[in-house]
Amino acid sequence: MHFLSPAKLNLFLQILGRREDDFHEIVTRYQAIAFGDQLSLSISSRDSLQVINACHLETPSNSIWKSVALFRRYTGITTPVSWRVVKQIPVGAGLAGGSSNAATALFALNQIFKTGLSDEEMRSLAEQLGVDTPFFFSTGAALGVARGEKIIALEESVSDRYVLYFSSEGVLTSRAFAAVQPSDCSSRKNLEYTQNDLEKPVFRLRLDLKEKKHWLESLWAELPVYIGLTGSGATLFVRYPEILEKDLSYAAQIQRAVTLSGGLLTSPIRRDPTAWYSIYSESALAAT
């Protein structure tokens, strides 16, 4: 069985302050995108994991094995399984690669063993696997509140396009939040839903990302776009309404900016509640 494990963007992320448990209270807008890893699952004689493009992730601490352990405890099914992952999402990129793998693995196990777990059950289990893991059991667009793990589904679809800019070095989420100062936080009375409050602390840690954003702002200056960091980084992204591509002048400028900047152009993706995210046909995935 083959599954897309999609990346996510934080279209905005606002920090409301530090909680009594020492974590930060946030509100964020999650969006799944048509870019991600490919997971394949089969029943086997022994447990195994192969990660193409990132063999250093073939460890017992991989988020996929955490999903397997949780699934086995919950269902009592202990049949060995074999995983093959074609890794595309960079580590420490703010794209939730590990969380997406964990969620996709949980969904895949439910499918292959026909255990009939509901989305609500899997979402509840996913809260034990990571802050943004539950999001992937939404339709692909949601608000995240509390630490980001409490999901409020959004039914409206967005007609945006995104251009992703990866970094050769990731950012640890824990390090980014540890660098947050009170002045970085948003006022509860003046939430703008257009910014990422983690940008300032991350840019203090990573001057190269701040400079990269300035470079992108100059490159895209003549177009009505938003440029920001997703999550705690290190990925920067450009967001613009898809309708711009229908204007020949704008379309040419967009193509030029994407080409000159070396960005990866992608789109939002939605999930049918009865299925999983997909931008690939089953035959195409089987051929990889």
UniProtKB/Swiss-Prot annotation:
Binding site for ATP: P90, V91, G92, A93, G94, L95, A96, G97, G98, S99, S100
Annotated EC: 2.7.1.148
GO BP term, pick one: isopentenyl diphosphate biosynthetic process, methylerythritol 4-phosphate pathway
Active-site residues (renumbered): K8, D132
Catalysed reactions, semicolon-separated: 4-CDP-2-C-methyl-D-erythritol + ATP = 4-CDP-2-C-methyl-D-erythritol 2-phosphate + ADP + H(+)
Alphabetized InterPro entries for the sequence: GHMP_kinase_C_sf, GHMP_kinase_N_dom, IspE, Ribosomal_Su5_D2-typ_SF, Ribsml_uS5_D2-typ_fold_subgr
UniProt pathway: Isoprenoid biosynthesis; isopentenyl diphosphate biosynthesis via DXP pathway; isopentenyl diphosphate from 1-deoxy-D-xylulose 5-phosphate: step 3/6
Molecular function in Gene Ontology: 4-(cytidine 5'-diphospho)-2-C-methyl-D-erythritol kinase activity; ATP binding
Enzyme class, UniProt record, top EC level: transferase
Pfam name, any one: GHMP_kinases_N
PANTHER family named among the record's database cross-references: 4-DIPHOSPHOCYTIDYL-2-C-METHYL-D-ERYTHRITOL KINASE, CHLOROPLASTIC
Family: Belongs to the GHMP kinase family. IspE subfamily.
NCBIfam families: ispE
Function: Catalyzes the phosphorylation of the position 2 hydroxy group of 4-diphosphocytidyl-2C-methyl-D-erythritol.
Name the record gives this protein: 4-diphosphocytidyl-2-C-methyl-D-erythritol kinase
